[in-house]
């Protein structure tokens, strides 16, 4: 055993209960001879968490934590991100990306509580999650030791993993494994790998979990009203809900109508392209509703500046920089812009589409029908438009004159 391994006595493992992290748990015990604390975060995975405690203990965990973080997840991570209207490469609502900082945060809290000198995760050396987890770890403890088995061990094939599991008494699922991997929380479920690596092949219908096929969704549209306060959704159809309850409810409504499916070939942080298929029914509805209320309450120039920051904000979340000073700076600016975002959006849900059909704000509306009408009013003199246009066209007219002069 190397000195580095001898220095590690207590490890907190981010444990999902799946075959890979079960093998990692046993591998940590075998290779390091250390105490292993297994930690699973309940972010809304549902039934996936039911067997986790028993499986972790059976595999050799000394202590098991299963923490319900659903409200914190939506309130402190999803909602701030949605106040920014963050979207990565025009399609991805960052459901996996935004979950990792919270898992890392709680994992480090457990490490401090349990006196652990190292943390471990099951992310591969080719993916984004290794970066997201470890940037979070170092934020909370710059000196923490990190064990990332996928970057060091020799179990480099699925068969090698299965052989190791059988050798160490870890149950291997006897049912045929679905030919893709998935990750689920309250915001979304993602699918990647396996048959999805053929970028031309359509994702099979049996893959989808949260959403009805749009063509099989109800033939009658459903209308939903979502109320916002300071940029955060607080009620659906007049019923107040907690953040987690609200997102779960929108997931149910959106799922019924086939809303929120995305098939994307995205650029990973490490440089390669990767295909991901996502279901984000509630998040898709929430973002559309939020933008609708912004349309009636937010100043044009404030919106223009904020919109210019969305790609950078989304990149920071995607790349794992949630705890960075630059993300916090952007968040402060964005949150200041949300003080006026108070109102209600009315949306129409129908066969995969989510469309705004109305918006209102009793306290912060900047829309005045008297000003917007084509009828005469006391505020706007239409003749003033001529001077406005001539001033704004000055640079264009000068450019045209200069180009004409060059041709002479």
From Swiss-Prot:
User: Where is this protein found?
Assistant: Cytoplasm
Keywords of the record: Amino-acid biosynthesis, Arginine biosynthesis, ATP-binding, Cytoplasm, Ligase, Nucleotide-binding
* Cellular component aspect of the GO annotation: cytoplasm
Protein residues bound to ATP: 14-22, 41, 122
Annotated S-S bridges: none
Signal peptide region: none
| Protein name per Swiss-Prot or TrEMBL | Argininosuccinate synthase
Source taxonomy? Bacteria, Pseudomonadati, Thermodesulfobacteriota, Desulfuromonadia, Desulfuromonadales
